[in-house]
Amino acid sequence: MLSYEQVLAAPLEELAEAAAKWQAAIKPLGEQQDAYRDRVIVPVRDSDWQGADADAAKPFMDKVSKELRDATKEAEAIHGVLVDAHREIDIARLDLRRLTDVEAPKMGRTVGPGGEVKPLRPVDPDDPDTWGPHLDFFQALAWEEDVSKQLSKAIINARARAHEADRAAAWALWQDTGADDMEFNPGGYANVSAAKGGLGESKFRESSDFIFAEMKTNSASPKVAEIRGLVKGSEGPLAVISPVAGVGSRGTGLALWYEQVKTGGPWDHKPQLEKKFDLQSNNDFYFKVPGREVSVSDDIYSNIHYGYVGRAAGISRPELMQGANGGIASTGTNDPGDDMSMKVGMDLYEKYGDRMTKEQMDAAILKLVDDMEARRRAGDTTMTQVRPW
């Protein structure tokens, strides 16, 4: 995320200058487009020009006309993105200055390098005057921490606003300009809000591709075959997934499973997605669902993998649920949304096995999102994995 100092020192003058240059380019591009149409396209279209030369020239003229139109639209989009980014970062910078210069002194706080919040007069156990007349030392200390946390959170939110605008603008400019310098991309993004949606949908699609590959690869891996052989090789009561799952082959298999899915383990995909997309602000961790005004947490992907690969390993549904809800798997201590995600993974394996297609997984994820969103709209506050976009 952009640092406190980076937001305050953001080169907004350069950004405004760039936006002005693109705005200045829009009018002459439009004029060239009109002139080419009136002086070349229309006269040729109204003439009786025929033959080999005409057959070769007309497609080329159409291409030039299209490029002029596309260049104008691209310039308009880039200008819009730059203006939006300037506004959002400027708002964030002004907010940081207000929090630092106005709100912090009111709250008895100072904001130092890195946006670190400190009390002007810290609570001192040896100085009752720092506690106030109505609080004891521990109450005063708790109040001091709470006030500092409130201000720190506001500073982080301002930084996040600048960070998200900067990231969305960079992505939009890459989309708008395209990979080929000789081609124009008129169907890009014309503002930061649209770019945030496009970036969110891109992360959703890439995450689905990533977790599908992980599910197919890991369910067919030697490690799963080893676990399945151990688990299937013994009968008996259900065991608990843990580092010391118990004696016998079943306990050994569950202990091996634990090592794969524990927090930070090879099959804990949350940090992998965090690194893949450089997720930093709270909003970064929610991906926009294509075609829906709803976003979904990156949590669901590791949960779906956990259920699918766990069933491929021969681990029973109750054992998988018990392991996750005990807070010992990579899914952590779960809520109902986590449970729904894991059950989707289990259902996919039980229904399709190793023949599951990407389309089948995608359909299941969309249904999961719709089910979660319906519950959230009905007032279920535990559905933290989805929220309005």
How would you describe each model-predicted region?
Residues 307-314, 347-352:
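Well-ordered alpha-helical scaffold segments within catalytic/enzyme domains
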Residues 10, 49, 293, 297-302, ...:
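Extracytoplasmic/periplasmic, Sec-exported soluble proteins
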Residues 28-30, 278-283, 313-331, 373, ...:
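Short, motif-level signal for alpha-helix interfacial/capping segments enriched in acidic residues
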Residues 324-389:
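Active-site or metal-binding loop neighborhoods of secreted/extracellular toxin and effector enzymes
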Residues 178-308, 315, 319, 388:
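Glycine-rich short-loop/terminal segments
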Residues 1-184:
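N-terminal secretion-targeting helices of virulence/extracellular proteins
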Residues 128-134, 208, 220-224, 237, ...:
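Short amphipathic alpha-helical segments that mediate assembly, nucleic-acid/protein binding
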